[in-house]
Amino acid sequence: MEESPIKFADIDINEILKTLPHRNPFLLIDRVKNIRADYSGIGVKNVSFNEPCFQGHFPERPVYPGVLMIEGMAQTAGVIGIKSVEGTEKPRAVYFLTIDKCKFRKPVLPGQTIEYHMRSIGRRKTMWWFHGDAKVDGVVVAEADVGAMLTD
């Protein structure tokens, strides 16, 4: 199957800050790359030991929380959705609505980079559904289907 054309090659942190309302410590993606015309793209999260979550998860063996990976998927999907409709619609917010088929496969450790491979699996008016695979070094560490709503 032929890949659809790239609409946005690289969205850096400055552009993400203009696109999403999330801020530190709850902005959980560092950039989004390869947003395609088929509403797919890849979010990137560089996991640092300095993240607040590692103070309690877990002090003796730090593991990046799975729920934060799911939120990272949702934030990536939000950027893809908003950027995909820019110019035709002007959404001001995106709300995370559903999580389905969520699985955590391997732990993510400080120093690793997570890539959130998101692709649209459906859209109806302002509702979007995405399937996501979180990968570290090409290996799936988590997966889920997420739903979101773009609002004006």
Curated annotation (Swiss-Prot):
It comes from Bradyrhizobium sp. (strain ORS 278). NCBIfam families: fabZ, PRK00006.1. It comes from the Bacteria. The keyword Methyltransferase does not apply. Disulfide bonds: none annotated. One of its GO terms (biological process) is lipid A biosynthetic process. GO terms for cellular component: cytoplasm; membrane. It is an enzyme of class 4 (lyase). The active site is at H57. Gene3D superfamilies: Hotdog Thioesterase. Its EC number is 4.2.1.59. Belongs to the thioester dehydratase family. FabZ subfamily. Involved in unsaturated fatty acids biosynthesis. Catalyzes the dehydration of short chain beta-hydroxyacyl-ACPs and long chain saturated and unsaturated beta-hydroxyacyl-ACPs. InterPro entries: FabA_FabZ, FabZ, HotDog_dom_sf. The lineage of its organism: Bacteria, Pseudomonadati, Pseudomonadota, Alphaproteobacteria, Hyphomicrobiales. PANTHER family: 3-HYDROXYACYL-[ACYL-CARRIER-PROTEIN] DEHYDRATASE. GO terms for molecular function: (3R)-hydroxyacyl-[acyl-carrier-protein] dehydratase activity. Pfam families: FabA (PF07977). It is found in: Cytoplasm. It catalyses: a (3R)-hydroxyacyl-[ACP] = a (2E)-enoyl-[ACP] + H2O. Keywords: Cytoplasm, Lipid A biosynthesis, Lipid biosynthesis, Lipid metabolism, Lyase. The keyword Lyase applies. SUPFAM superfamilies: Thioesterase/thiol ester dehydrase-isomerase. This is 3-hydroxyacyl-[acyl-carrier-protein] dehydratase FabZ.
